[in-house]
């Protein structure tokens, strides 16, 4: 009886080998890359778009400021022309019972109250207690109140925390403008007499002077 011979092929078939070794097809190296010129154009477009947005934002802010800001400069020119022609600041318009001097309006009280009460009164008038600008303004107000024997309150008080005299707008007193006479204590406020600027108790009673800026519409509405 012949013995059957069985031969096993150890060589893998091409089909099997292909199934194991074949990898998915790859794309060409430059398939996902834009040409350099296209990328440069894209970057320039993005930069231009950003600049355009910033320009639009800036223009909108500028327009808003210009709309909200009153036209002050033409009014100042009219004020100066009025002063040069008439030589009288009284021609400048202020509210009724207020007096004008340079670019301010002043109101002198007829009664005497404490410093805090005078501060509140001026605030109720849409004004502030007097902020002395310079010696010339101080002389004007002293002449204005010469007939009144009482001193008058100004918007200046002593702050204990800073150990300094400060105006109600937060600025520190300049000794070249005013020199305070008297002791400075916890509750000290400044009043002006005919020859001195005094430190006295804020609870004392004095007349007071309110001030407000001369409004441009006072001049601009007249033509």
From Swiss-Prot:
Residues 1-43 are cytoplasmic. One of its GO terms (molecular function) is signaling receptor activity. Expressed in natural killer cells. The keyword ATP-binding does not apply. The chain crosses the membrane at residues 44-63. GO terms for biological process: regulation of natural killer cell mediated cytotoxicity. Ligand binding may be calcium dependent. This is Killer cell lectin-like receptor subfamily B member 1A. The gene is Klrb1a.
């Amino acid at each position: 009886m012949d013995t059957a011979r069985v031969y096993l092929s150890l060589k893998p078939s091409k089909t099997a080998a292909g199934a194991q070794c074949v990898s998915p097809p790859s794309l060409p190296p430059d398939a996902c890359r834009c040409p350099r010129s296209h990328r440069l154009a894209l970057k320039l477009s993005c930069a231009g778009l950003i600049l355009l947005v910033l320009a639009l934002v800036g223009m909108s802010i500028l327009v808003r400021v210009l709309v909200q800001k009153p036209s002050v400069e033409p009014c100042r020119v009219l004020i100066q022309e009025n002063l040069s022609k008439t030589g009288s600041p009284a021609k400048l318009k202020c509210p009724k019972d207020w007096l004008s001097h340079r670019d301010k309006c002043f109101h002198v009280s007829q009664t005497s109250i404490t410093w805090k009460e005078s501060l509140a009164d001026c605030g109720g008038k849409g004004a502030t207690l007097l902020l002395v600008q310079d010696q010339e303004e101080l002389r004007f107000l002293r002449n204005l109140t010469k007939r009144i024997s009482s001193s008058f309150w100004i918007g200046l008080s002593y702050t204990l925390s800073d150990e300094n005299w400060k105006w109600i707008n937060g600025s520190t007193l300049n000794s070249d403008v005013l020199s305070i006479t008297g002791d400075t204590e916890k509750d000290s406020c400044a009043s002006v007499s005919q020859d001195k600027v005094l430190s006295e108790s804020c609870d004392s009673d004095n007349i007071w002077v309110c001030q407000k800026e001369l409004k441009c519409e006072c001049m601009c509405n007249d033509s």
